[in-house]
Amino acid sequence: MQHDVIIACDFKSAEDTFRFLDLFKDEERKPFLKIGMELFYAEGPAIVREIKRRGHRIFLELKLHDIPNTVKKAMAVLSRLDVDMCNVHAAGTIEMMRAAREGLTREDGTRPLLIAVTQLTSTSEERMREELLIDASINDTIVKYAQNTRAAGLDGVVCSPLEAGMVHGACGEEFLTVTPGVRFADGDVADQVRVTTPARAREIGSDLIVVGRPITAAEDPVAAYRRCVAEFVG
């Protein structure tokens, strides 16, 4: 897959979302968008259908994590929304991820890309040890989750850019690394711990970067998006 920038549309309503998207109406290539929990839970499938109608690709990030049968049935519903990519939590086990893939696969054999979350970019080793009782290093945990994801037949993982090269080393160059935790060099890291810049993210192995506030909260979102594309895609 070619390198690309995904804008995280972390808005609370359709009105806010479309006001933002209207800024890009003159862009020749419509940005790839991430729809997360807040917007999807507020607006439901209708928001997905309308954004697709406007010509955008969609990463529907709901991070499913439940028993395999429940996830399989949920994915069967999501498969009808014509999104381009969706995800689950790798911690849900190989069995759950396989069930997710089966549920997402349509009768004609096609399906959206399916990836799994390894460790959130807000996670640190200290939190893993103290709150989750995980003594393994964060790098070892991410590699193991990535290997499980590949074994389940998924297309890639969500990880920090700092671990993207490591994931490719363990799972192959064709295995997608989708990375949040990207900020401009002169920007605020906010609540994320493991972050880097767009240019550095590409250098160390990110295939797709997910960027929210540095674009959506910018004084000129279109200019910020173009800057991000220039730094990451070239």
Protein language model annotation of sequence segments:
Residues 27-28, 54, 81, 152, ...:
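Structural motif
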Residues 81-94, 181, 191-224:
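Glycine-rich phosphate-binding active-site loops on the catalytic face of alpha/beta enzymes
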Residues 23-31:
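A short, Lys/Arg-enriched amphipathic alpha-helix followed by its capping loop at the start of a domain
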